[in-house]
């Protein structure tokens, strides 16, 4: 005769624990690509990549050097043939030095304001082209004034020729500062374009 187990004899096994809830979905990777515009600058990715200070120093140095070159040329008013206004090369050098000083000072102030605001510098085509254009003016002005200065100094060396030679040297140094600034702007512009369009 079969034995039927009573309910009390049945050992109730515990229920298995419920499965853990699924982890929350990961947020999508953040990419600053939509706002990129090469003519107005790419969006800042936050922080300073170490080049902002170099750009500021280069542009401030270019402004100061061009200002010194301008002051030196303008001071060459010694009468007779020692008047810078008698030579179109020196008038051109003076005009270019004024333009370079104003441009570099405005760009330095713009960079400094961005650094104070905590905004990462975004290179633009205008920065790149502006540095190249003003640098080209400086090197052409220096090259135009150099031959006539060499001819003068081969005949006579005085305060006029010394000051003009110093002005040419400062203009060339201002060109070098803007040339390095243009290199940095081109590098950062290329890097920003690559990161913005590299999916």
Swiss-Prot record:
Cytoplasmic topological domain ranges are 1-53, 113-127, 185-199
Per the record, where are the segments of Pro residues compositional bias? 14-28
Which keywords does the record carry?
Cell membrane, Membrane, Transmembrane, Transmembrane helix
Q: State the GO CC annotations.
A: plasma membrane
Annotated Pfam families = CASP_dom (PF04535)
Question: Could you tell me where this protein is found in the cell?
Answer: Cell membrane
Q: How does it sit in the bilayer?
A: Multi-pass membrane protein
Q: What is this protein called?
A: CASP-like protein 4B1
């Amino acid at each position: 005769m079969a034995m039927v187990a009573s309910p009390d004899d049945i050992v109730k096994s515990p229920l298995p624990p419920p499965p853990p809830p699924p982890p929350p979905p990961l947020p999508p990777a953040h990419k600053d690509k939509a706002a990129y515009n090469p003519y107005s600058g790419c969006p800042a990715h936050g922080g300073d990549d170490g080049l902002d200070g170099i750009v500021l120093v280069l542009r401030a140095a270019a402004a100061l050097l061009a200002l010194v070159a301008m002051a030196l040329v303008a001071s060459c008013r010694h009468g007779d043939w020692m008047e810078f206004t008698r030579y179109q090369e020196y008038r051109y050098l003076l005009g270019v030095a004024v333009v370079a000083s104003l441009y570099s000072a405005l760009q330095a102030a713009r960079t400094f304001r961005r650094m104070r605001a905590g905004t990462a510098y975004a290179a633009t085509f205008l920065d790149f082209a502006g540095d190249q254009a003003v640098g080209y003016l400086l090197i052409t002005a220096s090259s135009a004034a150099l031959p006539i200065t060499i001819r003068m100094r081969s005949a006579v060396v005085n305060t006029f020729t010394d000051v003009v030679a110093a002005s040419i040297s400062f203009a060339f140094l201002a060109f070098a500062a803007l040339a390095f600034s243009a290199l940095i702007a081109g590098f950062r512009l290329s890097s920003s374009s690559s990161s913005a369009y590299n999916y």
